[in-house]
UniProtKB/Swiss-Prot annotation:
Domain of life according to the entry: Bacteria
Lineage: Bacteria, Pseudomonadati, Pseudomonadota, Betaproteobacteria, Burkholderiales
Keywords (A to Z) from UniProt: Aminoacyl-tRNA synthetase, ATP-binding, Cytoplasm, Ligase, Nucleotide-binding, Protein biosynthesis
Name assigned to this protein: Proline--tRNA ligase
Subcellular localization(s) per the UniProt record: Cytoplasm
Length: 581
């Protein structure tokens, strides 16, 4: 490819609405062009990256035995009504009507359509397992699209769906896809982690996210450097506290804490570590009558250490709270505690509540909590002496760096990541909702056991940039760079030797199957180099009249700060070695 034939459009400044590095650089490098909120044109340079991502994904999915299909972007609402998602998905699901007034949706995922294919086509256990995948445009009507391709409304995604005869074979399909994903992300050349994720109502541990490591990532990734334990912040656990609760050493006392309504300020006033304070969170569950109207509520008090934060996913698994909970209203709090939020605690309640305690609090002695009176707290509080043992003890909190890993291998660390893939065991959630069955070996109808597996094809280049960039621009890994090598001849239009040498090297690289571009635009050296550093092509060869007279060219990898001079006769061999050819 010659640059004069290609479309190159770079900008010196990023648009004002670009907040993150990837959005700024993708726009400046001419990879994408905004059309509307969360909607982008994939320009030629950007499309080359996307096609390389797709090619790797397609190769590994085929290698894993998955079969490619393409399902419609516009889907009949009837199938989504079968699963209940037509209403449950809320405004993120874009709904449209055709000229006849029939309802349709623009697909964000395709569980319904692929399950419909299975129930029509997969009649017998002899046809299983099957795994269908597509690389297709999706749409989610994000309330606030931002960060360019990181959180757009229209995007390209690879979604795959496995169908098995039972849970055991479904787990084999899951592990097959997990292994395929590891090969895919290894080939991308990115730093990533496969982390355990919450499985929601389905339960179990068969749910993992593939996170590209980046300091700008939205997700917190918890891992143990001494083992293979890794989980997202919602799923991560610390090692349960060991040993019995210490004996009480203090008498309970009511102390004035004027104006100090937070654990931090109370700890500061009393000269105590924050970990000796206990925060009170008040939740409520609603009781419904036969008509579905609220007929009453149950108030719950959660106790966590002052230096810990509540994990809503974990709280939602507590029996009684698993039906759905909300934060209590001020009126409910005053009714049960006789106090405004800020000084709440479990002692001296006006009305009884369900007491749920984090397991770290359950083994504390002589702790500090609110006195249920403005400007007062209680010190020296102990379970069994000053208040009854809790109704429930559970893991309710987010882990923090330095916690013990649950496998006992060391301490947990936390880093930021960008989710670009997810493998998930679905069970019979969709097959049951859509009555998708096959004839089992016993001759009876049986529900498909399903799994789903997604990769954000257009999100991945943005994540790669967040991980691989510098002040000059993008630094692409070889596997997904728009071009692997750029040949930069200086004064090509004025020097026949430079032109001949550049075209010869270009032709030799093409013959080897290298994705190479020859910059024949006639740009000044500074502008030419700045363009390719911004675009991020990994390997650059510079040819000049003076260098060729000395029998030399310059080679520079995009990560290098300076170019390396080498014999012109050696540069092809050097590139072959660097590219593994």
């Amino acid at each position: 490819m010659k640059a004069s034939q290609f479309f190159i459009s770079t900008l010196k400044e990023a648009p004002a609405d670009a907040e993150v590095v990837s959005h700024k650089l993708m726009t400046r490098a001419g990879l994408i062009k905004k059309l509307g909120a969360g909607i982008y044109n994939y320009m030629p340079m950007g499309l080359r990256v996307i096609r390389k991502v797709e090619a790797i994904v397609r190769e590994e999915m085929n290698r894993a035995g998955a079969v490619e299909v393409t399902m419609p972007v516009v889907q009949p609402a009837e199938m989504w009504e079968e699963t209940g998602r037509f209403e449950k998905m809320g405004p993120e699901l874009l709904r449209i009507k055709d000229r006849h007034g029939r309802d349709f949706v623009i697909q964000p995922t395709s569980e319904e359509v692929v399950t419909d294919i299975a129930r029509q086509e997969l009649k017998s256990y002899k046809q299983l397992p099957k795994n269908f995948y597509q690389i297709q445009t999706k749409f989610r009507d994000e309330r606030r699209p931002r960060f360019g391709l990181m959180r757009g409304r229209e995007f390209i995604m690879k979604d795959a769906y496995s169908f098995d005869k039972d849970r055991d074979t479904a787990q084999i399909s899951y592990q097959t896809m997990r292994a395929a994903y590891k090969r895919i992300f290894d080939r991308f050349g990115l730093q990533y982690r496969a982390v355990r994720a919450d499985s929601g109502a389905i339960g179990g541990d068969l749910s993992e996210e593939f996170q590209v490591i980046a300091s700008t990532g939205e997700d917190a990734i918890v891992y143990c450097p001494s083992s293979d334990y890794a989980a997202n912040i919602e799923k991560a656990e610390a090692l349960a506290p060991a040993g019995p609760r210490p004996a009480a050493a203090q008498a309970m006392a009511r102390v004035a804490t004027p104006g100090n309504s937070t654990c931090e300020s109370v700890a500061g006033q009393l000269g105590l570590p924050l970990s000796q304070t206990v925060k009170s969170l008040v939740l409520a569950t609603d009781k419904l009558d036969d008509k579905g109207d609220v007929a009453g509520s149950q108030v719950w008090l959660l106790l966590l250490r002052g230096d810990h934060e509540m994990n809503e996913i974990k709280v939602a698994k507590v029996p009684g709270l698993d039906v759905g909970f909300r934060f209590a209203t001020v009126a409910e709090i005053e009714e049960h505690f006789g106090c405004q939020p800020g000084y709440l605690g479990p002692i001296g309640l006006k009305k009884p509540v369900k007491l749920v305690v984090d397991r770290e609090v359950a083994v504390m002695a002589d702790w500090v909590c609110g006195a249920n009176e403005a400007d007062f707290h209680i010190t020296g509080v102990n379970f069994g002496r000053d208040l009854p043992e809790p109704d429930v003890v559970a893991d309710l909190r987010n882990v923090v760096a330095g916690d013990k890993s649950p496998d006992g291998a060391g301490e947990l660390a936390i880093e930021r990541g960008i989710e670009v893939g997810h493998v998930f065991y679905l069970g019979t959630k969709y097959s049951q909702a859509m009555n998708a069955t096959f004839l089992a070996e016993n001759g009876k109808p049986s529900l498909f056991e399903m799994g789903c597996y997604g990769i954000g094809v257009t999100r991945l280049p943005a994540a790669a940039i967040e991980q691989n960039h510098d002040e000059r621009g993008i630094i692409w890994p070889d596997a997904i760079a728009p071009f692997t090598v750029v040949v930069c001849p200086i004064g090509m239009d004025r020097s026949e030797p430079v032109k001949e040498a550049a075209e010869k090297l270009h032709a030799e690289l093409l013959a080897l199957g290298v994705d190479v571009i020859l910059d024949d635009r006639g740009e000044r050296p500074g502008a030419m180099f700045a363009d390719w550093e911004l675009i991020g092509v990994p390997h650059r060869v510079v040819l000049s009249d003076r260098g060729l007279k000395e029998g030399q060219v310059e080679y520079q990898h995009r990560r290098d700060t300076e170019a390396t001079k080498m014999a012109a006769a050696d540069v092809l061999g050097h590139l072959k070695q660097r590219l593994g050819l």
